[in-house]
C-alpha cells in the first residue's frame, strides 16, 4: 500500500485528522484540507490517487469537488462522506461518478477497505 497519496477535504478538522491517523500507518500519504480551494491547488502541484470529501461545506461543496475532479483528473478516485446522507444526494453523487459514498459517522475500517479496493482495481486496469 506504500506511497498512495490521499487528500481529505472536510470542514471539520477532526474528521481529516482521524482519517489521516488511521491511514498513514498503512503507508498512505494523507494531506488534509478544511476547504476545496487549497486542495485544488495541491492537486495541480502533485499527483494524488484518492480524494475523500465531505458533501456539505461552505464555499465549494462536495458535489462541486466531485465534478471538478472527475472532469480535470478522471483517474483520481473520489469518495464522498456526509452527515446529510439521503437517497437524493447518493443518486446525484452516483450520476456524477463518485467512487464511494459513506454516511457519517464513517467506520474507518469500511473507508479503508473502500480505498484499498479502488486502488487495487485501478492497479489492475492500469497494468
Residue locations for each model-derived region?
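Short amphipathic alpha-helix used as the core "switch/output" element in two-component signaling
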Residues: 41, 63-75, 92
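Acidic, metal-coordinating helix/loop segments flanking the phosphotransfer/catalytic sites
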Residues: 32-50
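C-terminal output helix
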Residues: 106-116
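Acidic catalytic/metal-coordinating carboxylates
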Residues: 4, 34-38, 61-64
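Two-component/phosphorelay signaling modules centered on CheY-like receiver
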Residues: 13-31
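The feature encodes the CheY-like receiver
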Residues: 16, 58, 86
Amino acid at each position: 500500500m506504500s506511497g498512495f497519496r490521499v487528500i481529505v477535504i472536510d470542514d471539520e478538522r477532526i474528521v481529516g485528522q482521524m482519517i489521516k491517523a488511521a491511514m498513514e500507518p498503512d503507508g498512505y500519504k494523507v494531506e488534509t484540507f478544511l476547504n476545496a480551494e487549497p486542495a485544488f491547488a495541491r492537486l495541480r502541484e502533485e499527483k494524488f490517487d484518492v480524494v475523500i470529501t465531505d458533501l456539505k461545506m461552505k464555499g465549494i461543496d462536495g458535489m462541486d469537488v466531485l465534478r471538478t475532479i472527475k472532469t480535470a483528473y478522471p483517474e483520481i478516485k473520489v469518495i464522498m462522506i456526509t452527515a446529510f446522507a439521503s437517497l437524493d444526494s447518493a443518486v446525484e453523487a452516483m450520476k456524477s461518478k463518485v467512487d464511494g459514498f459513506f454516511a457519517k459517522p464513517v467506520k474507518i475500517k469500511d473507508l479503508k477497505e473502500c480505498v484499498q479496493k479502488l486502488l487495487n482495481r485501478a492497479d489492475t486496469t492500469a497494468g
